[in-house]
């Protein structure tokens, strides 16, 4: 059995590396790199189903493969791969989603002269993520962690001729570097206190230790990578990259890496109530804040980006509930409909001549029926519509939150955010699909290409069936609550319906404005992203520079200029007085100095004679 698992993943690794290595040997191969890359991803997906089927059929828990790598007197680092429910399931989901995204990329970026290099970057992005999820030691995980960070920088800044793209890429790196500090400090603590980076070892050795400090470092790392509140601004800014990058970044690679880190290391903090409370409150604040920001955005990609951040907050809430299985389930189901939403937005942007403002769309239901249907399906799955993929994970999370007897504040914030999800999803559909067309009549509208339709079909099937298939085949790691009041059971659906009704009512109120200049404070708060970017990116740097300049100039005025100016003259006068005081023409002074000189010489000669 171990042989089959190891062979399957070795073949997947070879297939994924094949399009990257072969162009180095054969120059003509580079012309067909796009085709070979898609075939490699497709074959890798079907091969990944072999260990997944065996895992489900045989009821296997974990298989670990170790390869000796670095040996030191007191510390060893091995190449260690862990094949369990999390890594096997996520690998298949990531390959399936990436296969669809690469097909879409062939259509979306066909005119880009560097499309082959773009495919290589996407492939490396996927490889580093698979390395991260299969890692069984912190050093190997760190390599994958930094790999997805580097590739995100290259892909977000793909159109490097645009200043906004360069700024967004740099912003992503800086915010993630803050999170990386937490991961590095946690690794240092584990190495110095437990003398091991092997996950299985330090989970056993740390049972009687206080792990609050390293766990806070891990939360900081997840906050940066998964765009939790405080380190979240890079995620909407990352929409400056090409749409396929946004789809891959938000569905199955970088942004879920932080959540996956906490899921993988959950045994470390499942009994640490303070850390679980931090995760719960951080996730609740993130999911509500980003849902509020999504309500008034007008860029179609930024609305979907903020919805991703809101769902990541929901996953963090689930970690805080000590339910890593549900967090991982939501990661898997979320990948399908979030990738589909981004591909639909890419189709709309491409058809409307690169227009991203939803106020300049409308009436696309009749013009782009297939894209519109997939967009509606993805939005319904996002809101948790019964029996779609999002329902199976989102409903279970809300149920766990309702029955947890934990923080009521976090429960209320999460329920409000769930309601807001329905509002911004309906707003997105209303502005883009309904009403009259508000775009230029000469737009190059076309959705008949197979490289557009086939990926959307595959992701649509996943958005419908993935939740049912995953929950039916993967066992729960905790006993489920079998009975609960109907109101509690239907809470997720009820708040979604309330959100839809509220959205419709707000839409009606827009034509009934009572004041010429209405009070727009809440709208401005949402539209300006809670004033977070202006404060963090403008006000604080400006104040820092101003204080630095003030301190520098005052220091020079008070010290340097004064020391070299008036005080230097005063010092010179003192020195002149000291030198001038003996030279007053008084005979007693001269005789005293001569006598002292003679006595000094006599003492010196006397000492010299005694020594000799």
From Swiss-Prot:
Keywords: Electron transport, Membrane, Mitochondrion, Mitochondrion inner membrane, NAD, Respiratory chain, Translocase, Transmembrane, Transmembrane helix, Transport, Ubiquinone. Pfam families: NADH5_C, Proton_antipo_M, Proton_antipo_N. GO terms for cellular component: mitochondrial inner membrane. The keyword Nucleus does not apply. It is found in: Mitochondrion inner membrane. GO terms for molecular function: NADH dehydrogenase (ubiquinone) activity. GO terms for biological process: ATP synthesis coupled electron transport; electron transport coupled proton transport. Its main location: mitochondrion. It is an enzyme of class 7 (translocase). The keyword Transport applies. It catalyses: a ubiquinone + NADH + 5 H(+)(in) = a ubiquinol + NAD(+) + 4 H(+)(out). Its EC number is 7.1.1.2. Disulfide bonds: none annotated. It is a multi-pass membrane protein. InterPro entries: NADH_DH_su5_C, NADHpl_OxRdtase_5_subgr, ND/Mrp_TM, NU5C-like, Proton_antipo_N. The chain crosses the membrane at residues 4-24, 45-65, 88-108, 118-138, 141-161, 172-192, 202-222, 243-263, 275-295, 327-349, 372-392, 406-426, 459-476, 490-510, 585-605. Belongs to the complex I subunit 5 family. Core subunit of the mitochondrial membrane respiratory chain NADH dehydrogenase (Complex I) that is believed to belong to the minimal assembly required for catalysis. Complex I functions in the transfer of electrons from NADH to the respiratory chain. The immediate electron acceptor for the enzyme is believed to be ubiquinone. This is NADH-ubiquinone oxidoreductase chain 5. It comes from Chimaera monstrosa. The gene is MT-ND5.
């Amino acid at each position: 059995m171990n042989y089959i698992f190891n062979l399957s993943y070795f073949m997947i690794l070879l297939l994924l590396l094949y399009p990257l290595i072969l162009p180095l040997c054969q120059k003509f191969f580079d012309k067909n790199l796009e085709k070979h890359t898609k075939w490699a991803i497709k074959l890798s997906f079907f091969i990944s189903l072999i260990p997944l089927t065996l895992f489900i059929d045989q009821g296997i828990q974990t298989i670990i493969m170790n390869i000796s790598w670095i040996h030191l007197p007191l510390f060893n680092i091995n190449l260690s791969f862990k094949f369990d429910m999390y890594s096997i399931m996520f690998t298949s989901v990531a390959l399936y989603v990436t296969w669809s995204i690469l097909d879409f990329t062939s259509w979306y970026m066909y005119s880009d002269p560097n499309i082959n290099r773009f495919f290589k970057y996407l492939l490396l992005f996927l490889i580093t993520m698979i390395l991260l999820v299969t890692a069984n030691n912190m050093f190997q995980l760190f390599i994958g962690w930094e790999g997805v960070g580097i590739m995100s920088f290259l892909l977000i800044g793909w159109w490097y001729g645009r200043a906004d793209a360069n700024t967004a890429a740099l912003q992503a790196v800086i915010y993630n570097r803050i999170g990386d500090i937490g991961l590095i400090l946690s690794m240092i603590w584990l190495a110095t206190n437990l003398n091991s980076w092997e996950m299985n070892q330090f989970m056993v050795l740390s049972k009687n230790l206080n792990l609050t400090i390293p766990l806070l470092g891990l939360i900081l790392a997840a906050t940066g990578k998964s765009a939790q509140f405080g380190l979240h601004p890079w995620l909407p800014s990352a929409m400056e990259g090409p749409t396929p990058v946004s789809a891959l970044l938000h569905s199955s690679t970088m942004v879920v890496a932080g959540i996956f880190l906490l899921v993988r290391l959950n045994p470390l903090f499942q009994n640490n109530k303070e850390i679980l409370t931090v995760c719960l409150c951080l996730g609740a604040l993130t999911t509500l804040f980003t849902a509020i920001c999504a309500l008034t955005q007008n860029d179609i990609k930024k609305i979907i980006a903020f919805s991703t951040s809101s769902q990541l907050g929901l996953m963090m809430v689930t970690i805080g509930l000590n339910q890593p299985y549900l967090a991982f389930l939501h990661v898997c189901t979320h990948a399908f409909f979030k990738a589909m939403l981004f591909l639909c937005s890419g189709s709309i942007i491409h058809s409307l001549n690169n227009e991203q403002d939803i106020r300049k769309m409308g009436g696309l239901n009749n013009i782009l029926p297939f894209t519109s249907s997939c967009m509606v399906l993805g939005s319904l799955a996002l809101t948790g519509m019964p029996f779609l993929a999002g329902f199976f994970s989102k409903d279970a999370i809300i149920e766990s939150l309702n029955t947890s007897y934990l923080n009521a504040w976090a429960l209320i914030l999460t329920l409000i955010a769930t309601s807001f999800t329905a509002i911004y999803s309906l707003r997105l559909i209303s502005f883009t699909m309904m009403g009259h067309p508000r775009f230029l009549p000469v737009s190059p509208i076309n959705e008949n290409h197979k490289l557009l339709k086939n990926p959307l079909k595959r992701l649509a099937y996943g958005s419908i069936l993935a939740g049912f298939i995953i929950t039916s085949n993967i066992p729960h790691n905790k006993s489920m609550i079998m009975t609960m009041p109907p109101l509690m059971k239907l809470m997720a659906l009820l708040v979604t319906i309330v959100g839809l009704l509220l959205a419709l009512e707000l839409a009606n109120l827009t034509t009934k404005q009572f004041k010429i200049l209405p009070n727009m404070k809440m709208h401005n708060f949402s539209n300006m992203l809670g004033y977070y970017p202006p404060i963090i990116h403008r006000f604080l740097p400006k104040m820092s520079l101003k204080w630095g300049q003030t301190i520098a100039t005052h220091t020079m005025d008070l010290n340097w200029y004064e020391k070299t100016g008036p005080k230097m003259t005063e010092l010179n006068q003192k020195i002149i007085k000291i030198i001038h005081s003996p030279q007053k023409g008084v005979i007693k002074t001269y005789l005293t100095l001569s006598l002292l000189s003679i006595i000094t010489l006599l003492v010196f000669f006397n000492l010299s004679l005694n020594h000799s």
